From Swiss-Prot:
SUPFAM superfamilies: RNA polymerase subunits. A zinc finger (C4-type) spans 16-36. It comes from Drosophila melanogaster (Fruit fly). GO terms for cellular component: DSIF complex; nucleus; polytene chromosome interband; polytene chromosome puff; transcription elongation factor complex. Residues 1-40 are annotated as: Interaction with Spt5. Gene3D superfamilies: 3.30.40.210. Belongs to the SPT4 family. Interacts with Spt5 to form DSIF. DSIF interacts with TRX, RNA polymerase II and with the FACT complex, which is composed of DRE4/SPT16 and SSRP/SSRP1. DSIF can also interact with the exosome, a complex with 3'-5' exoribonuclease activity which is composed of at least Csl4, Dis3, Mtr3, Rrp4, Rrp6, Rrp40, Rrp42, Rrp46 and Ski6. DSIF may also interact with the positive transcription elongation factor b complex (P-TEFb complex), which is composed of Cdk9 and cyclin-T (CycT). This is Transcription elongation factor SPT4. InterPro entries: RPABC4/Spt4, Spt4, Spt4/RpoE2_Znf, Spt4_sf. It is found in: Nucleus.
Length: 116
């Protein structure tokens, strides 16, 4: 896990709506999302950071060994990079992003558990 991917402060954190990676707004804008950058294109794009992340999330998980972790399997994170992840993320992706993901063959499962 690169130390620059770990949030430096607990205030103002956001979670990716696709993979639930938690970082600061500035970190998403500077580096994008390590798991989803290919199709979310958040790097150097404030609008995409706002559209594809949420500041409304519950719980956090520090994931250091995604392939060996039962928590990673439970949260569907085992194929993602090491980092800090939200347990539940509230928010919806733009329809254009959902269409793009579908066209790329990426199955989207909402990480919003607030209605359960």
């Amino acid at each position: 896990m690169a130390f620059d991917a770990i949030p430096k402060d607990l205030r103002g954190l956001r979670a990716c709506l696709v993979c639930s990676l938690v970082k600061s707004f500035d970190q998403f804008e500077t580096d994008g999302c390590e798991n989803c950058e290919e199709f979310l294109r958040m790097k150097n794009n404030k609008d995409n950071v706002y559209d594809h992340t949420s500041n409304n999330f519950d719980g956090i998980i520090a994931l250091t060994t995604p392939t060996d972790s039962w928590v990673a399997k439970w949260q569907r994170l085992s194929r993602f990079t090491r980092g800090i992840y939200a347990i539940s993320v509230s928010g919806t992706l733009p329809q254009s992003t959902l269409r793009d993901m579908k066209n790329r063959g990426i199955v989207y499962k909402s990480r919003d558990r607030s209605q359960r």
